[in-house]
Amino acid sequence: MRYFTADLHLQHPLLADLRGFPTPVAHDAAVMAELYLLDPDRDELWILGDICTGGTESMRSALAQLATLRVPMHLVAGNHDPIHSCNRKPERHLAEYLAVFRSVQQHAVADLGGATVQLSHFPYLGTEDRFSRDRFTEFQLPDHGDWLLHGHTHAAERRSGERSVCVSLEAWDLRPASEIEVLREMR
């Protein structure tokens, strides 16, 4: 079964607090506990960006935690991931990411229930972020009629548009969304 999530932000003091945890360690333990429930023989995890808070130290801490998972993982990078092209010299981190993830990309395409689904960290172009501002517009995909799974917004609502599903942890009770759950949202 494929699972989708975004915006883990491991070791992030502010996000830990906003999500109701006393410390980043407690936050990370709760997030990782949900990921440990995935079966490495049957499941696959797609993380749609922002595993960390940004910066090399944060990146290495997040990668070390994620490396303890045995489930196959793919990353669609987000703006807080040093591997994303919005950051300086992202290529210098590629080997470290590929030691943990089977693939690392800025955007991907999947087939879910016969539908073509775009996978991106960012919502469709024209969708404002949670602060009602246009940011990272050069990385937002235009809506050409496909469904989109994304993160970035940290929205509690799962549906973010006519053909968009947000897989940020906030929308899924701090756990990854299964392909079956995503397909339900797409109905």
Locate the predicted segments by residue.
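Core catalytic region of metal-dependent phosphoesterases/phosphodiesterases
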Residues: 3-5, 10-111
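Conserved beta-sheet core of the metallophosphoesterase superfamily
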Residues: 92-187
